[in-house]
Amino acid sequence: MGRLLGQAALIVLLAAPALAAPRDTMSLDTGWQVRLDPADAGAIKAHPREARWLPASVPGSVQQDLIAAHRVPDPFIGTNEGAIQWVGLSDWQFRTSLTVTSAMLARDHLDLVFDGLDTFATVRVNGTVLLTGDNAHRRWRADAKALLKPGANEVLVTIASPIRHLQPMVLAEKNPLPGEYDSAFGDEPKGKQTSPYIRKPKYQYGWDWGPRIVTIGLWRPARLEAWDDARLDRFRVAQEALTDTEARLTAHATVVADRAEAVTIRAIVTTPDGRTLTAERQASVAAGRNDVSVPLSITQPQRWQPVGYGAQPLYTVAATLAAKGEVVDQARRQIGLRTVTLDRKDGAFGFVVNGTPIFAKGANLIPFDSFPARVTAQTMQSLLTAARDVNMNMIRVWGGGYYLDDSFYEMADRMGLMVWQDFMFGGAVTPPDAAFRENVRVEADEQVARLGDHPSIVIWTGNNEVLSGWENWSDRKAYKKAIGPDGQERIGTGMAVLFDRVLRGAVTANSPGTPYMPGSPSSDYEGPVDTDANGDRHFWDVWSGSKPVENYLDSCPRFMSEYGFQSMPAMATIRGFAGKGPLAADSAVMKAHQKFLAGEGNARLQFYIDQRLRPAKDFADFVYLTQVNQAQAIDLAARHHRACRPVTMGSLYWQLNDVWPSISWASVDYDGRWKLLHYAARRFFAAQAIVAEHKDGATRVTLVSDATTPTPARWRLTVRDMAGAVLSTREEAATLAPLSAATVATLPDATLFGDAAPAQSYAVAELFVGDRRVSRVLVDRLAPKDMALPDPGIVTTWSGDSVTLTARNLARDVMLDVGAFTGGQPSDNGFDLLPGESVTVRLPAAARKTLTIRTLAR
């Protein structure tokens, strides 16, 4: 524990340029080699070539190294996943040479720092053990000075197979803890998973959207840090109070010192418009860890706002640590000033930012890649930009992966995207022992301290589906029966302590202005979990439960944090992993890249096509129809959630992205190509939207506005037949109240459609602000397959990198399918065209050769 300092001198003055110099740091990210651990005789016998050293990447994984050396095939291609499984079942060694000078050895400390060891690692320096690690989510540091010598030094990191390391213990358990997904490769017996017992990204053990690639390696940067006297171990900035006239902050510095001495902490604040303020505190520190705080005050603060509600001004807070009159360390934070609360009154679940109730619109983010070390800033930037560009304002970082790099949250800060941050628990029941909780406590304390200053993070949640699974899932109920009342009490109490005390305590200590919930879904122990009445919901009756998509209309949850519907990725993405041969949904390669129901999920795609749409003409048309089904399902659900405001205050669909090229719930596939769902999100998440729901023989029209001021508008409902004739029109003026959803009409079929045949007629609901149509949706009384859709008669006209589509008749769900073209994607897609209507889409002219126009017409 740190030592909290008492009274100390506080000096506030006009800032001068910071003269801080960082501690000396030497990167250890180059020169690494990897081989099988000589002690792993079985692996060496099976793979003798890998007993010799080969080049390794840090940050990275041994799987990446073997792929680069062509020792194993790329698991993302074809059916290669099985061929890489032996790697995660073997023990490995990594080594590098570290050159140390006499000047370096003259420093007080030479710390080896590993930002990520994956996972059961032993670090030796010149043959002597320096440290052992057992948590991939933690940073590991140890002073290596006593083991180093002038000249070349060997750093050797031995990492055990996480599965084999834990398997003897798990196999000896009469009732092992329930995990997530059983292995499809026979390396773990069914129901005897090792993943619940390890602190490592859980998705790497396989999920219903991703492969089983149990990575091993130094997955984040490594370095040597030289320092004297004292160093800054942590630096964060807490917001104590915020008004329109003043922001009161506290800069918290954790100082690690060799001995008792006087130090000076200086904090320099740079405002968004370039003004500076400096505060300085002199204090006496003791040997060990010390907490030093520096109060700060900012007048006329500029508030950070979520996208769509204002700007995102950011402040820079730089800190220097001086000892013996010399600057010995420095740190820097970028912060935003905002208040956030979670409205929980009477079971509600809604975010209030700077006093404004925000309807959360967005999606769930899974890890960017099976190999996190190769994720680039550009990849993250592109995906977050894609989210913002379709009117999302929130991203949920799902709990089965890893805590993302600082750059991700910095991007979210700049874009105004709110982040829902799970702690990294993906669904498995957690061990009840105190040692496991202590390991997690250190992890959580470190991660919240690292990330807690980001204004984009508006909630921390303790886990994904651990608590709801414990309460509701059939396999958990069977487990509880097997272990009896005493076992249930022991396991249940352990989870309650972990999620309600340990993790909540980490947030309270390091980010006290950010709400916390013990899980998702959660009612915060106020009652049953995963209900419409209290807390957030994960709704999977549609898709996983094979229920009709219209079931989305049956309830108004308080916050829908998960719901989803699968589709195929783009044809170009499919060709990338399946090759040039014939394609079929039930082929080995397509089933290998479909993880739902162990590869049988493609039958679920066909089930919903049969239920709702026309038959596919060929495989490419099948791909199109799956994307139409996905877009229509999520459009229906998201608009319904928005129409349920203020009962419902958020809609986050599953999922935004893919971890590998696959058939999944993603709206943006692994190669960054937008599915029709992502284009649809731009429409159903628009700031002002019209919702027209047909249910029980009537159409309900609701107008939705996210604006903070009243908006004059008008809405129109037009009934047409398939020949294009207008059968009736209703139009009314309306004022959209701020932050609202208002039902303006409920019209029985006889009133709206008269005697028009359901298969031969449809309604067009439109919302106008001024002369601009801001939202449109079509209303059918039958499933699309039962509508008498005419030949749309679409004509295309090219002009440079733009193509204009003109429809002679109604065209539903128009897709510009560019096939195998990889040079760009349409600016819009998946839209409807009314008779005689034209739309111009930006698309590289080179796509003309492969372009196919698809619609729902037979």
Q: Where do the protein language model's features map onto the residues?
A:
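Substrate-binding/catalytic cleft of secreted carbohydrate-active enzymes
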Residues: 394-414, 418-592, 629, 633, ...
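Active-site-adjacent substrate/metal-binding segments within catalytic domains
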Residues: 65-100, 104-114, 118-126, 131-134, ...
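Short acidic/polar inter-strand loop motif in beta-rich domains
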Residues: 160-167, 322-328, 768-775
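Extended carbohydrate-recognition surfaces in non-catalytic/accessory domains of CAZymes
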Residues: 21-113, 192-221, 225-230, 345, ...
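Extended acidic/polar, glycine-enriched regions
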Residues: 146-154, 252-344
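Carbohydrate-binding surfaces of carbohydrate-active enzymes
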Residues: 253, 586-828, 833-844, 848-850
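Short glycine/proline/serine/threonine-rich loop/turn segments at secondary-structure transition edges
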Residues: 104-108, 148-152, 165-166, 299-314, ...
